[in-house]
């Protein structure tokens, strides 16, 4: 998709590509931090994504930065299927590649002003041009605000107000006839609320209003500095892409999402990353008519200093800690007290500090062999990745055992240590493409087959340390009293802090057809795939009234599906559509308590659908050049919300429309989404044994002015 198409459809973030790309689902929930991506049956709510994101050939290493402002994005490409041979880690189901406007190829001034529902507004301005000495300079800045679409019934305030600023500065220059230089600096700042979760009562199937009594907020500052060099030698082209990526963010959560004073989380990340890639491609005598190739080397280092204290309040202490502890004290030890164990503090903090190092290096090669109408590709990547985590979690309280202790006694729990892992992966790819060429002089056809391996990195569970320390605290308190528990009340153990990489094999067949000419033609494409996955990573909620969540390797799964896309043009009329179907199931998943083998993989939709039709009226009037009117619909579902497949979101459709008037100096755009006011769920989770949903955004509209000079 290109710039005009993105702006006409109101696609200002990657989340709005959902359903437009078959089998792609990026639900909009929580905040800008929650960039959960599902593609072809697989995905992740936490940590490492299944879809890699590249902006101007630079990989975005932290998923927290995926929800970005698409300021002056010239082109968007999504390569489906494992792309690990060239792109490496976390591209198990595909790669989303974005290219920004280049001042070497575009010169002018652009400005955009929008206003819409919920007092939403957006303003951006950018300028591009070249100087006489060959230096090309371009840059832009944007500001976005909304009052929010959801209300917190506890205090009547908006849950999800948001302010965001983005900027980019791009410099390009041909230093020598054979040396080209690019420098791209981008930054973004977000300050918002979010998490308008509603408690679900399974017995009555009632969805309560959003109501929580503590702050839910997210702030993020991310900066990326990229330097690209291209050396054009007589026999080869060597590209160097270097980047420095900084991320500073803070998430504050009322983690029980109720109006009770249970517990809150403040997660603060200070992350820095370096990447370096070299890509070598041949020219002239280094390649032949039948053989072409590319080779590359990639390395990265990332360090994340994270602080994630959990603040336990009165109700949380009473229910989660004292309630569990007192229920496990034998009656003959309790001395007739209903609550023999007391804690002096009305609130206390479980502190958690982490230092996480992630690093890796890779070498890869792809060869392309042309034999008549056949193009054969063979590639291999050797990928090494290591990680380590230093952690320290602690809490200090004063407790009293009423039958034997006249006063309170201090008690401290500390859990600290270091874990680390190293992985080596071989990532191969084989593909065959048959180009039938022209069909009767009025079209063309191609068919392809691909076998490739996918790989998603392992990592650490930082959000489970509060549960681990609660477990240790309860056992420690009981042991201090001479009571030893066979069952500490939770299944969480220290070994849950790390999880392994996820690996898959992808088998795919497909093709495309094109008929007609530019203003009257049809293009069709389709594919069928099978993915076999081992060591699948799934987000789990520990049993009971736990406060955290964790990623675990649960076993094996498989996903089969089809993807179809079509485009029909007749003069100024255009009709496009895409459809995806996925049947993704566990083939082996037994956690010791339940066997979920054969069940659907949660959160990933069974079907996606998008249809868009539009007509452009062209006028021979310089003051009113054209009018474009479009209507679209997008569907997604069914979605299974849990591993047991007891909760299912049905297939739903959302309808939208947009219109653009192209005047002499400006374009006037109008867009409306969710025209029917559909009420639907976009997310589900559990916290301390309670179930929660988030609803999708209601009907909304936007009107804007676009200026291009």
Predicted regions and their residues:
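Extracytoplasmic beta-strand/coil segments of soluble accessory domains associated
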Residues: 15-58
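Membrane-embedded beta-barrel scaffold of Gram-negative outer-membrane proteins
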Residues: 228-233, 237-253, 448-450, 473-552, ...
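C-terminal beta-signal and adjacent terminal beta-strands/loops
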Residues: 455, 633-642, 657-709
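Short acidic/polar hinge/loop motifs at secondary-structure boundaries
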Residues: 56-80
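N-terminal periplasmic accessory domains that precede
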Residues: 15, 36-41, 54, 78, ...
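Gram-negative outer-membrane beta-barrel transporters
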Residues: 281-282, 286, 294-296, 300, ...
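Transmembrane beta-barrel wall of Gram-negative outer-membrane proteins
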Residues: 108-110, 115-146, 150, 154-193, ...
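Solvent-exposed loop segments that connect transmembrane elements
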Residues: 151-157, 195-211, 256-263, 311-350, ...
């Amino acid at each position: 998709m290109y710039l005009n198409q993105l702006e006409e459809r109101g696609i200002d973030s990657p989340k709005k590509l959902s359903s437009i790309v078959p089998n792609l689902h990026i639900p909009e929930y929580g905040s800008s931090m929650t960039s959960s991506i599902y593609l072809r049956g697989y995905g992740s709510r936490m940590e490492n994504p299944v879809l890699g994101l590249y902006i101007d050939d630079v990989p975005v290493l932290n998923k927290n930065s995926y929800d970005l402002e698409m300021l002056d994005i010239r082109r968007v490409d999504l390569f489906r299927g494992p792309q690990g041979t060239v792109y490496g880690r976390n591209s198990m189901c595909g790669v989303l590649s974005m290219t920004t406007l280049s001042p070497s190829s575009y010169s002018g001034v652009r400005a955009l002003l929008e206003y819409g529902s919920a007092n939403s507004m957006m303003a951006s301005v950018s300028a591009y041009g070249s100087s006489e000495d060959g230096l090309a300079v371009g840059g832009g800045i944007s500001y976005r605000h909304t009052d929010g679409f959801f209300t917190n019934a506890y205090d009547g305030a908006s849950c999800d107000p948001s302010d965001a600023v983005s900027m980019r500065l791009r410099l390009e220059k041909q230093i020598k006839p054979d040396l080209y230089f690019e420098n791209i600096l981008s930054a973004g700042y977000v300050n918002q609320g979010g998490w308008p979760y509603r408690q679900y009562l399974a017995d009555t199937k009632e969805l309560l209003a959003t109501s929580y009594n503590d702050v839910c907020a997210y702030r993020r500052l991310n900066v990326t500095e990229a330097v690209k060099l291209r050396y054009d030698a007589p026999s080869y082209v060597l590209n160097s892409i270097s980047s420095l990526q900084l991320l500073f963010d803070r998430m504050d959560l009322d983690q029980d999402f109720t109006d009770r004073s249970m517990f809150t989380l403040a997660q603060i990340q200070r992350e820095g990353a370096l990447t370096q890639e070299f890509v070598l491609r041949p020219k002239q005598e280094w390649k032949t008519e039948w053989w072409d190739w590319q080779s590359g080397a990639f390395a990265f280092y990332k360090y994340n200093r994270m602080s994630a204290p959990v603040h336990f309040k009165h109700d949380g202490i009473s229910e989660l800690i004292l309630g569990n502890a007192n229920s496990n004290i034998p009656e003959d030890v309790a001395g007739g007290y209903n609550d023999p164990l007391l804690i002096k503090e009305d609130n206390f903090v479980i502190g958690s500090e982490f230092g996480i190092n992630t690093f890796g290096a890779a070498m890869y090669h792809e060869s392309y062999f042309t034999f008549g109408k056949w193009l054969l590709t063979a590639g291999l990547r050797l990928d090494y990745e290591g990680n380590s985590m230093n952690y320290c979690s602690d809490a200090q309280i004063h407790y009293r055992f009423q039958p034997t202790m006249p006063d309170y006694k201090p008690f401290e729990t500390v859990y600290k240590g270091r874990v680390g892992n190293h992985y080596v992966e071989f990532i191969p790819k084989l593909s065959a493409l048959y180009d039938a060429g022209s069909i009767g002089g009025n079209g063309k056809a191609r068919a392809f087959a691909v076998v490739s391996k996918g790989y998603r990195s392992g990592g650490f569970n930082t959000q489970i340390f509060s549960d681990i320390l609660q477990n240790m605290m309860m056992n420690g308190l009981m042991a201090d009293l001479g009571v030893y528990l066979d069952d500490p009340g939770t299944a969480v153990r220290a070994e849950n802090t790390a999880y392994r990489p996820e690996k898959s094999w992808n088998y795919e067949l497909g093709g495309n057809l094109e008929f007609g000419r530019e203003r009257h033609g049809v293009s069709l494409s389709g594919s069928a795939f099978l993915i076999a996955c081992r060591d699948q990573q799934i987000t789990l909620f520990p049993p009971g009234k736990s406060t955290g969540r964790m990623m675990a390797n649960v076993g094996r799964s498989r996903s089969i599906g089809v993807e179809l896309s079509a485009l029909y043009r007749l003069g100024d009329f255009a009709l496009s559509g895409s459809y995806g179907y996925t049947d993704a199931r566990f083939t082996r998943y037994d956690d010791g308590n339940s066997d979920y083998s054969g069940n659907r993989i949660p959160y990933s939709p069974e079907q996606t659908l998008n249809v868009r039709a539009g007509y452009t009226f062209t006028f021979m009037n310089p003051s009113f050049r054209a009018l474009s009117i479009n209507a679209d619909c997008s569907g997604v579902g069914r979605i299974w919300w849990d591993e047991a497949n007891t909760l299912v979101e049905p297939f739903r459709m959302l309808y939208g429309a947009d219109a653009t008037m192209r005047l002499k100096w400006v374009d006037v755009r109008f867009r409306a989404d969710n025209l029917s006011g559909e009420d639907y769920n976009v997310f589900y989770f559990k916290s301390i044994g309670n179930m929660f949903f988030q609803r999708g955004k209601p009907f909304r509209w936007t009107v804007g002015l676009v200026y291009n000079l």
